[in-house]
Amino acid sequence: MAKVTLVSWTNKPLQVIHAMTQNMMGNIITDLDSIKEEDAIQTIRELQKTSLGGPLEYVDFTFQVEGVPRALTHQMVRTRVGAVYSQESLRFCAKTGEQFKYDIGKSVKTEEQLKVYHEAMKNAQQAYENLLEAGVETQDARGVLPINILTNIGVKYNLKTLMGIAEVRLCTQSQPHWTDIITQMKEEITNKVHPIFGELLVMYCDRHNKCGYESIYDRKCPKQAKFQ
């Protein structure tokens, strides 16, 4: 299971959002300590009623995400607006011996399936280590590594961007890895920063009161009946 740790966030995030929102009203606030928490929370709640979410972009959260498959991080880094990434590089980090760890999907269940899966991983590891021993550079030998090898990545999202990610990745349509990671991010923010921010990280249907996956290509969800 992946591990998510919130390591840094914007100082006085509630007050920053309130002050930047007041800017739009012509009210300049330079002393963040003068802002009452209840006023800032009310401002954040009001921002949920409008499409003007700019003030939410002033608040950043930085996480360390450990033990996730590279297949997942390939998806993570597609989000570029309001996001920064710093990932373990296979050009420099050799995945030999105990460093060669990989993910096993939930549908790989039977003894025969697991046997085939582990054998494939064993062969990939052996080929990788043989290439390194033969003098092939790490950045070239990595080509034989499986896409589900575990990696670590540092990520920073602004609040508005993270809210958009949560809408999609907390949904039942999303793969379990994503749901786990965003759930942990939500818990970290709730416990370390303020519960109001955790409340903002919800599924699309919970925010918009309609399903965002109704095409013939989407899987069915138990919650869809609520919006039909």
Ranges and model annotations:
Residues 1-228:
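Family-specific signature for flavin-dependent thymidylate synthase
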